[in-house]
A protein has these predicted regions:
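Buried hydrophobic positions in well-ordered alpha/beta secondary-structure cores of metabolic enzymes
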Residues: 12-15, 70, 123, 185, ...
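Flexible, glycine/charged-enriched surface loops at secondary-structure junctions
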Residues: 35-40, 192-201, 224-232, 321-329, ...
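Glycine-rich phosphate/nucleotide-binding loop
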Residues: 48-50, 240-341
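N-terminal beta-loop-helix "entrance" segment that forms/cooperates
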Residues: 34-59, 241
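N-terminal glycine-rich phosphate/adenylate-binding segment common to multiple enzyme folds
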Residues: 50-157, 167-169, 256
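Glycine-rich phosphate/diphosphate-binding loop of Rossmann-like nucleotide-binding domains
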Residues: 7-24, 28-29, 33, 145-232
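Phosphate-binding loop/pocket of nucleotide- and phosphate-handling active sites
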Residues: 354-369
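Short acidic loop-to-helix transition motifs that present clustered carboxylates
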Residues: 232-239
Length: 369
């Protein structure tokens, strides 16, 4: 029997309610599965609440725990828009080099959706592309200098706008980061019985950045003759996903495209309330819901826990506790399909008086394992 350690980041807003629900469900799945291992939890804080007491949204003790434990389950945390502290998610990804964002998108009977046969996985590169954060604000001398330098060095393409009114973002795409994310996608496909990996780009326009990603993906795909590899342009990919999502299996993309497409695919499957996720690297694996912290519902025992519990399913599979993971996912699916012990957003009408709370839905899932 394996003995695992895991960090539980309780988050803020509705995070503590969801963290408790997911932790109890993961424990129950292990307890009820013969031969399954155990998990010892290290409870840590991150986000707005700890920022107010410690002056940082991500204490060093939390980062160290993520490094030292076998996996991390993270509840939602608040990210201020436009002002305030940096995103905790970005801090974790950059500090620990969690280079792969994994977003399974799967439809479950009972979840309102236009599609009933979604079962695909989005793999997003986490560390570079336009999200590298290398930006130059309009009106600054260094921005004008950058534009002047680009115009001087480029023989045929010029920045045609006024430097004083132009902001610039840099889009780095490297061989090393492209190779490891594409290889991650193919390895994931092989380990999980997936048959196809689609690598997505806009190389017809951005020939030296997306073109590089495409070249690397084509080369890496040759190392996996048992997995079909194919390419798509990002705009065509979006149309194809809306028209024929059943044709796709594992999709791997650079950072910006991956951010957009992962939410698109979550929408195909019913929304962020049923969308789990993970950020994985050589220094840690963080499993999390992809929705926000909903501060207005803090402490109200109201919000749907499905996404974070499904993230717990992903964590169990990462820990090689597959029978327990399957048992928990089957229990989630059964509760959703029955439609009785579900939160307000999963009822046919959001004001349905029979809707249950976060805690009660978790109780129903535990009973169904």
């Amino acid at each position: 029997m394996a003995e695992h350690t895991a960090t539980l980041i309780t988050g803020d807003g509705v995070g503590p309610d969801l963290a408790d629900a997911a932790r109890r469900c993961v424990h129950a799945a292990l307890d009820k599965t013969p031969g399954a291992g155990t998990i010892s939890w290290v409870v840590c804080e991150a986000g707005l609440d700890v920022m107010e007491t410690e002056g940082t949204p991500m204490p060093e003790a939390t980062i160290q725990s993520v490094r030292e434990t076998d996996a991390t389950l993270k509840a939602p945390v608040t990210t201020p828009v436009g002002t305030g502290f940096r995103s905790v998610n970005v801090l974790l990804r950059q500090t620990l080099d969690l280079y792969a964002c994994l977003r399974p998108c799967k439809s479950y009977p009972g979840v309102r959706s236009k599609y009933q046969d979604i079962d695909l996985v989005v793999v997003r590169e986490n560390c570079e592309d336009l999200y590298a954060g290398v930006e130059f604000e309009k009106g600054l001398p260094e921005t004008a200098e950058l534009i002047e330098t680009v115009n001087r060095l480029s023989t045929d393409k010029k920045v045609m706008t006024e430097a004083a009114t132009t902001g610039v973002s840099i889009k780095p795409i490297s061989v090393a980061n492209s190779e490891r994310i594409v290889r991650f996608a193919f390895e994931y496909a092989r380990a999980n019985g997936r048959k196809k990996v689609t690598y997505v780009h806009k190389a017809n326009i951005m020939k030296f950045s997306d073109g590089l990603f495409k070249q690397v993906a084509e080369r890496v795909s040759q190392d996996y003759p048992d997995i079909e590899g194919e390419e798509r342009l990002i705009d065509n990919m979006c149309m194809q996903l809306v028209q024929k999502p059943e044709l796709y299996d594992v999709i791997v993309l650079p950072n910006l495209y991956g951010d957009i497409v992962s939410d698109l695919c979550a929408g195909l499957a019913g929304g962020l309330g049923v969308a789990p996720g993970a950020n994985i690297g050589d220094n840690g694996a963080v499993f999390e819901a992809t929705h926000g912290s909903a501060p207005k519902y803090k402490g109200l025992n109201k919000v749907n826990p499905t996404a974070l519990i499904l993230s717990g399913v992903m964590m169990l599979r990462h820990l090689d506790e597959r029978p327990a993971a399957d048992a928990l996912e089957n229990a989630i699916a059964a509760v959703i399909a029955e439609g009785r012990n579900v939160t307000y957003d999963m009822k046919p009408h959001r004001d349905d008086p029979t809707a249950v709370g976060t805690r009660e839905m978790a109780d129903a899932i535990i009973a169904a394992i």
